């Protein structure tokens, strides 16, 4: 299995709100769940469908997917078609936009040892597109002010900003089981201001296991809550 970052993009909503939770959760093993495996399977299928649509080499994964079904097939096809529409949009700005699928993105300039994997990154002259697939249907996810997406964007800027002179970042979340496509655009300078200010400050606290504990909605995703009583857990997240 691949190494997971202490301060990952996917857990950033939690550790930005509650910095010491990062080191606290380090003491507990993530046992996973059926929902997590469904998401993993869906991402594998999305990757395959998108590569096939773009004419890239790929291998049909369905026989190895534990939770593959007709709904997942429809979701993955819809995702691939949506990303293709963004590629066509990018071609209006750049003849040959770069499309990266399941790309490792390093944002350690701002977050110690920080990295993550972007579902799809599209780079065109002036504009960076970050696309994230969400298979869950419990909570509708917004791209606006979404720290996971913003961290992915920072990682992509590290790779391509000097080549493509990017000035705008467009972030899109595709969440078909909630019929949700959320898109948010921000200026690169605005993103960098956040990275050099709030993000860097909170990341330093989180990496050191310092800062104030802060209860809230983010507690739902805290591994340490597995080991406390149900009444206390409900009290924290209410």
Language model features with spans:
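Short, well-structured alpha-helical interface segments that form or flank functional binding sites
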Residues: 115, 147, 214-217, 231
């Amino acid at each position: 299995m691949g190494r997971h970052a202490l301060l990952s993009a996917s857990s950033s909503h939690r550790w930005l709100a509650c910095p010491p939770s990062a080191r606290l959760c380090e003491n507990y093993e993530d046992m996973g769940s059926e929902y997590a495996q469904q998401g993993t399977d869906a991402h594998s299928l999305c990757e395959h469908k998108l590569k096939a649509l773009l004419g890239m080499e790929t291998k049909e994964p369905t026989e190895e997917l534990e939770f593959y079904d007709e709904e997942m097939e429809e979701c993955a096809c819809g995702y691939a078609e949506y990303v293709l529409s963004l590629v066509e949009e990018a071609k209006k700005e750049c003849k040959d936009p770069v499309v990266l699928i399941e790309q490792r993105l390093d944002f350690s300039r701002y977050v110690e040892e920080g990295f993550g994997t972007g579902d799809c990154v599209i780079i065109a002259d002036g504009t960076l597109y970050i696309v994230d697939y969400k298979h869950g249907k419990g909570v509708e996810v917004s791209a606006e002010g979404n720290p996971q997406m913003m961290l992915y964007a920072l990682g992509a800027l590290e790779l391509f900003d000097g080549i493509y002179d990017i000035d705008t970042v467009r972030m899109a979340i595709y969440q078909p089981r909630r019929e949700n496509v959320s898109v948010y655009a921000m200026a690169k300078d605005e993103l960098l201001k956040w990275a050099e200010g709030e993000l860097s400050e909170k990341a330093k606290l989180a990496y050191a296991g310092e800062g104030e504990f802060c209860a809230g909605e983010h507690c739902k995703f805290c591994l340490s809550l597995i080991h406390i009583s149900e009444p206390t857990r409900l009290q924290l997240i209410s």
